Swiss-Prot record:
Stated name of the protein: FMN-dependent NADH:quinone oxidoreductase 2
Lineage: Bacteria, Pseudomonadati, Pseudomonadota, Gammaproteobacteria, Vibrionales
Its EC number(s): 1.6.5.-, 1.7.1.17
S-S pairs: none
Annotated family: Belongs to the azoreductase type 1 family.
Length: 195
């Protein structure tokens, strides 16, 4: 079993709720599955281009670097993706990465009816953190991070999607990063156990 652990946050771990929760999830996963291979991808240190005329011209080329990156992504069985919510969605580094690896006829295909059919198996966990409290309407209508990641998981055909999102990490719930980790331990452990 191969797991890709993706982060998209430039903060240091002890200053980041999402990164700290992600590390907790990865620690639990490794304890439960010591023989599984886990690889890390830090999108704040790796450069993935935003879509432009050059990248789009290679989008359908099965021999392009994009296709190679897409096939590498597909070779994993499980994905743990960790990111904060910025401006109502995922950071642009994560969006750019997904835009460059989610390629038609590698991770999904269009059916004759025009719908997407995923070509991946596998599972995904998304761990996020939001500065404000977006857990209830009307704010929940504007939180697109978790919705976006779930949509991506469904589009590429993943069999399972789970998420844990900490709300109000910068707002009225004045907790330290360590307190957030303590607060989330049980939920993260349960999520990873079924992953």
């Amino acid at each position: 079993m191969r797991v890709l652990y993706i982060t998209a946050n430039p903060k240091l771990i002890h200053h980041s709720v999402s990164l700290s929760l992600g590390e907790l999830a990865l620690q639990y996963y490794r304890e439960l599955n010591p023989s599984h291979i886990t690889d890390r991808l830090d999108l704040t240190t790796e450069e993935y281009p935003h879509l432009n005329s050059d990248t789009l011209s290679n989008f359908m080329n099965p021999h392009s670097n994009l296709a190679t990156q897409s096939k590498i992504f597909k070779d994993y069985d499980k994905y743990i993706i960790v990111a904060p919510m910025w401006n109502l969605t995922v950071p642009s580094a994560l969006k750019a990465y997904l835009d460059t690896v989610i390629i038609p006829n590698v991770l999904f295909r269009y059916t004759e009816q025009g719908t997407c059919e995923g070509l991946c198996g596998g599972k995904m966990i998304y761990i996020g953190a939001r500065g404000g409290d977006y857990s209830h309407p009307p704010q929940s209508e504007y939180a697109f991070d978790d919705k976006y990641m779930e949509g991506i998981a469904k589009m590429i055909g993943l069999e399972s999607y789970q998420s844990y999102v900490a709300n109000a990490v910068g707002g009225y719930r004045r907790r330290s990063v360590a307190q957030w980790v303590e607060h989330a331990k049980y939920d993260i452990e349960q999520m990873v156990t079924s992953f």
